[in-house]
Curated annotation (Swiss-Prot):
PROSITE patterns, alphabetized: PHOSPHOFRUCTOKINASE
Top EC group: transferase
Protein's UniProt name: ATP-dependent 6-phosphofructokinase
E.C. number(s) listed in UniProt: 2.7.1.11
Length: 327
């Protein structure tokens, strides 16, 4: 059984990460474990920037956005020699367990620490993209969804006033879950996501069909990287004759106080991660990751969830069908 654990946040920040850290710390202390907070993710692990945490270290954190431990992208961690330094830093402090909060890249780093150094690692899915396998939802997704929907509501006000077409670019990388959910909740007329082949002419045809039905304005929700928003706006305006403007929401989607569901999810996952570390699991095959499925906490080997065939969360086809019916 582990006696000392570390906790870090890695990759892009997500609302609810602080709540997850709090869940880990409070649950670990209740079990009599020592807890070290590692600053700036794997970079801090490599640079030996760790501090012992107590109950008061995480007071008033459940409602705060971002991550008070800090986060950083550290591609150098792929180097085995860099990982050896990180492992040495943990071994010298007697840390034998680690909770990593982040996406699939963060999971991969945790799995290597388990396989190469015997550290019992558990990953928690912290990303607004909802693109991690093994879980229905990730920490931060629902808060980002609220942010996007609020922006869509505001854009609808001005779009309807000017009978304009508005394009909203939503984060998500190669996963359209955030765009899809926001399109349904925001009543968007059109949607473009990575899971469905995107063609400009098809989108224009749909918009023209809407105009023919009497639509005076429209909101198009599109996942980042599918197209250049400014160029797409000009193309739509040229083809339809309707004024069209693009809005990139950007990093505002990552900020803000986490909504209640994210706080609950993060707290449950943090506590469950400690339970896993206290149980007599076999870590010879690698670390584990935590998820929520049908509102129940579950876990799986990290290697299974980051395998190429499982790396991305499943496409919510029923959500897409619903969205299309409501356009």
């Amino acid at each position: 059984m582990v006696k000392k654990i570390g906790v870090l946040t890695s990759g892009g920040d997500a609302p609810g990460m602080n709540a997850a850290i709090r869940g880990v710390v409070r649950a670990a202390l209740s079990a009599g474990l020592d807890v070290f907070g590692i600053e700036d993710g794997y970079l801090g692990l490599y640079e030996n920037r760790m501090k012992k945490l107590d109950r008061y270290s995480v007071s008033d954190m459940i409602n705060r956005g971002g991550t008070f431990l800090g986060s950083a992208r550290f591609p150098e961690f792929r180097d085995p020699e860099v990982r050896k330094v990180a492992l040495k830093n943990m071994h010298e402090r007697g840390i034998d367990g680690l909770v990593v909060i982040g996406g699939d890249g963060s999971y991969a780093g945790a799995d290597l620490l388990t396989k190469e150094g015997g550290i019992h690692c558990v990953g928690l899915p912290g990303t607004i993209d909802n693109d991690v396998a093994g879980t229905d939802y990730t920490i931060g997704f629902f808060t980002a969804l609220e942010t996007v929907v609020e922006a869509i509501d505001r854009l609808r006000d001005t779009s309807s006033s000017h009978q304009r077409i508005s394009i909203v670019e939503v984060m998500g990388r190669y996963c359209g879950d955030l765009t899809l959910a926001a399109a349904i909740a925001g009543g968007c007329e059109f949607i473009a996501i990575p899971e469905v082949e995107f063609k400009r002419d098809d989108l224009v045809a749909e918009i023209k069909a809407g105009i023919a039905k009497g639509k005076k304005h429209a909101i198009v929700a599109i996942t980042e990287k599918l197209d250049d928003i400014d160029s797409l706006a000009k193309y739509i305006e040229k083809e339809t004759g309707r004024e069209t403007r693009g809005t990139v929401l950007g990093h505002i989607q990552r900020g803000g106080a986490p909504v209640a569901y994210d706080r609950i999810l993060a707290s449950r996952m943090g506590s469950y991660a400690v339970d896993l570390l206290l149980q007599d699991h076999d870590y010879k095959k690698g670390g584990f990751c935590v998820g929520v499925q049908n509102e129940k906490m579950v876990h799986e080997l990290i290697s299974v969830c980051i395998a190429p065939e499982n790396k991305k969360s499943k496409f919510k086809e029923d959500w897409y069908d619903t969205a299309k019916k409501l356009f």
